[in-house]
A protein has these predicted regions:
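N-terminal, membrane-interfacial amphipathic/helix-forming hydrophobic leader that caps
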Residues: 1-77, 218-296
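Hydrophobic alpha-helical transmembrane segments
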Residues: 4-11, 52-53, 90-95, 125-129, ...
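Transmembrane alpha-helical core residues of multi-pass small-molecule transporters
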Residues: 13-14, 58, 167-168, 185, ...
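Juxtamembrane helix-loop-helix connectors linking adjacent transmembrane helices
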Residues: 26-51, 71-141, 148-153, 281, ...
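Membrane-embedded alpha-helical segments of multi-pass membrane proteins
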Residues: 56-64, 125-130, 138, 142, ...
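Small-polar-interrupted transmembrane alpha-helices in polytopic inner-membrane proteins
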Residues: 98-104, 132, 136, 157-173, ...
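Membrane-interface helix/loop boundary segments of multi-pass membrane proteins
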Residues: 138-163, 167, 195-202
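Functionally important transmembrane alpha-helices
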Residues: 182-242
Length: 296
């Protein structure tokens, strides 16, 4: 089947399965069914149980759609399952994500007058860790494991990176306070995640990075995460008391993030031009490690 037909088939299935699983959420929290967007955003920000069940529903909807397309069309299981939860890959991604977030915060502190307030440890961070891990796994499975891998099989590598990253960015278009800088930065993050995936054919690396990026940005340092508000252990604020220009969407809405992410993209591209190990195909359902070759 043509890759575009497969992708166009995937999204309606993703919506269908997500709605079906979300029906359970509506049964448990009937008030969410008729809530306005503002009321819904408030419910997600204040009700941890609702937030967790909602993410589980989306997680199940995403994987149901991926498995349906893979089993019915490709007749095989999704390839990324082989590398999705490798401990060493997750750890590497977590550390790399932490480095980037800390670098962004360091530059922010050096270029603006900031103050850090300690709010104290909140047990809710453990719940947020579960939620952000579910988000990282489901979004990476969809964006890199399914969409990018299938595009890469039937088109140019760079075209595949650009298109899958654009789709990844647009997936966040309905988030609160979404703006063009946020769209650009999520697009750039998508490119970087594709690079990480190609570097070792290991989806656990971008999953670890994605998880670390969100967890540190929100529940640790107190910024919004792609427009989603959380209570942080720390709170980094403008010393004058005024809000940062990017505050509504989070660090992903800042030009500092644009510069840092762009630097890492260029650095990874230059240092790996002759070192990245690529396969001739990223099989949608199985990766033949023996087929890996060095890219010239």
């Amino acid at each position: 089947m043509n890759i575009w037909t497969k992708i166009l088939l995937f999204f309606p299935l993703w919506l269908l399965f997500s709605v079906l699983f979300y029906g359970i959420v509506f049964l448990i929290y009937p008030e969410s069914y008729s809530a306005s967007k503002t009321e819904f955003d408030t419910l997600i920000s204040t009700n941890y149980g609702f937030l967790l069940i909602s993410q589980v529903a989306l997680f199940l909807g995403t994987f149901s759609a991926i498995f349906f397309v893979s089993k019915v069309i490709d007749k095989q299981k999704p390839a990324f399952l082989n590398s999705m939860l490798k401990p060493e890959g997750l750890l590497f991604g977590v550390v790399l994500g932490a480095i980037e977030i800390l670098l962004i915060i360091l530059i922010l502190s050096l270029t603006t007058k900031t103050k850090i307030t300690f709010h104290g440890f909140n047990i809710s961070i453990l719940l947020y860790a579960i939620i952000f891990f579910l988000i990282a796994v489901s979004e990476e499975a969809m964006s890199r494991g399914f969409i990018f891998a299938n595009l890469y099989n039937q088109s140019n590598k760079y075209f595949s990176i650009i298109i899958s990253s654009l789709i990844f960015s647009l997936m966040h278009a309905f988030n609160s306070s979404f703006n063009w800088i946020g769209m650009l930065n999520i697009f750039l993050i998508g490119i970087f995640f594709c690079q990480l995936y190609l570097k070792r054919m290991n989806l656990s690396i971008p999953i670890g990075f994605h998880f670390s990026w969100n967890l540190l940005q929100g529940p640790v340092f107190g910024f919004s995460v792609s427009g989603f508000t959380t209570q942080g252990i720390l709170k980094i604020e403008n010393f004058s008391g005024s809000k940062f220009p990017f505050e509504g969407f989070g660090l992903e809405g800042s030009l500092i993030s644009t510069l840092v992410i762009s630097f890492f993209i260029v650095y990874l591209y230059i240092t790996n031009t002759r070192k990245i190990m690529l396969s001739e195909k990223i099989e949608p359902s199985s990766i033949n490690v023996a087929a890996l070759k060095a890219e010239a």
